[in-house]
Amino acid sequence: MIRALAVVALLICCRPGVCAAPSALLYMTESPESVHSFLAHADKIDLLVPTWYHVDENGLVTGAPNPLVMATAKQHGVPVMPILALFHKKHFHDLSLNPAAQERMNEAMVREAKLHGYTGFQFDFENVDWIDRDGLTAVVKRSAQALHQAGFQLTIATVPNAPGYPTGDGFSKWIFTDWRGAYDLAELAKAVDLICLMTYDQQTRWTTPGPVAGWQWTIENLDYALAVVPKEKLSLGIPLYGYHWFTGAPNVDKVTGVESPNPSANYISAPDAQLLATTYKAPIQWDATDRTAWFFFYRDQMREWIFFTDLRTFRERYQLTQDRGLQGFCSWVLGNEDPAIWDFLPKKH
């Protein structure tokens, strides 16, 4: 009887999405810290997405792989799918209206994938105007068709956009029109092999202090995406970094000499955040509502705030991908992570 119950418990535990390890997609830049992190932990990564390529408004693709990274990926059996990035609003608009430029872009992606053994490419098109929503969808569909016909995959990173419209004027309107409004998740999901939902940068240098990816905000954006994207095609963004808010020196108008406030914020890695906490003897606290690590300290008699991803913050969002049965998680960016995360993640190769 005991053995039978154990077997039943094992079967329940191992239903897909309950105890299966989510697919681990990690982004990598060309910074030494990022490359070193991949070289040290390649055996725990399912898919490497490096920031090697860019495209301009004429469809000209520029970039090249890192040979050491490619050799290490091959040694460990890690598939490589580089980003193809474009962050310029007008340049993307021009590209979306130019079929010949899109054809050049698609031909270049197929050429590079064949030449270097990539599994495909990931589009990272940001700062796209909301009026180019249909244009973005059309570009993605054409590129997906071209890559699929050649035997390669196309994925896309999308800015989280719940509830799908601005909830007010000011910041809400700006972030919708300039960042969130261009992604038609339902249509994009029909074309691509995977959507990486960038559920991070809730608070940034543009905002007051707060979590990089608060729990309720993450849930709202995940639920919004899951309403139109199959869970097997959705990867949850988990940030590996944080932000550091502080008071900057006043801005001074060069003409009038008038001073204005300068609240400032910088991007910060988890190890650097932990170093500041140690340096200023600041206890790292846990925000039970937003389920994230944070702390504050005083320097020059002024309070400074840091919200960042430690192991607990990461682990709770990793568990969320399991609970929802998602394809996996996607984390920006290697080299910024709490080192303890690697003891938690399972070996894949």
Predicted region positions:
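Conserved, mostly hydrophobic/aromatic
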Residues: 48, 123, 195, 236, ...
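Substrate-binding surface in catalytic domains of secreted glycosidases
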Residues: 57-60, 129-275
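The substrate-binding groove and active-site-proximal loops of carbohydrate-active enzymes
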Residues: 93-99, 125-133, 206-213, 304-307
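Glycan-recognition patch characteristic of GH18 chitinases/ENGases
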Residues: 21-109
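Glycan-binding loop/region signatures in secreted carbohydrate-active enzymes
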Residues: 240-319, 341, 349
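Sec-dependent N-terminal signal peptides
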Residues: 4-13
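A cross-domain feature marking catalytic cores of carbohydrate-active enzymes
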Residues: 28, 52, 82-86, 125-127, ...
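Short, acidic/polar
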Residues: 28-42, 98-114, 176-188, 309-322
